Design a protein with these regions (language model features):
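Acidic, low-complexity intrinsically disordered regions
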Residues: 3, 18-19
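Short, functionally important structural connectors and interaction interfaces within domains
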Residues: 7, 25, 30, 83, ...
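Active-site-adjacent, His/Asp/Glu-enriched structural segments that form or flank metal-binding
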Residues: 62-77, 81-144
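Bacterial N-terminal signal peptides that target proteins for export
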Residues: 1-8
């Protein structure tokens, strides 16, 4: 009888254990990160980095992944991720990849995306900082 009680107590402890992980304090936000919200609801984070010099990285994370899909929609978020590289409103056909490669951003290495269970993230990394390049990369993020 004592073994059953001990086993039951152990089982309850293991079931309750994950709730402790939920009580961890939130991570502090880097004081150098500028955070804002656009009228359309998009939250943005901007941080200056000295290295690599005169280079910028652009990311857009969308709360879209397998968890939000219905059974009839399985794989849709991942499919749309791939389609974004096949042309957008402002970069039809392969113009997006051609633009990026022309400025030294390599497809697959510096220009990429992934879809997980709860997010889809697109990135353009190691972009040479010029007004034109920054404007074009922001336009790409807009299209995605």
């Amino acid at each position: 009888m004592n073994k059953i009680k001990a086993l039951l107590l152990l089982l309850v402890a293991f079931i309750a254990l994950p709730t402790l992980a939920q009580q961890l304090p939130t991570l502090p936000v880097d004081k150098d990160v500028r955070i804002g919200k656009l009228p359309n609801g998009l939250t943005y984070y901007i941080r200056h980095n000295n290295l690599p010099e005169n280079r910028a990285n652009f990311y857009i994370a969308q709360k879209v992944g397998a968890v939000q899909e219905e059974e009839s929609q399985r794989g849709l978020a991942h499919f749309l991720e791939h389609m974004c590289f096949n042309g957008t409103n402002n970069f039809p056909g392969d113009a997006l990849t051609k633009f990026c490669e022309r400025i030294g951003v390599k497809f697959g290495q510096n220009l990429n995306a992934y879809t997980s269970t709860d997010e889809t993230v697109y990135n353009i990394d190691d972009v040479p900082v010029t007004e034109s390049n920054v404007d074009s990369c922001l336009l790409i993020l807009h299209d995605w």
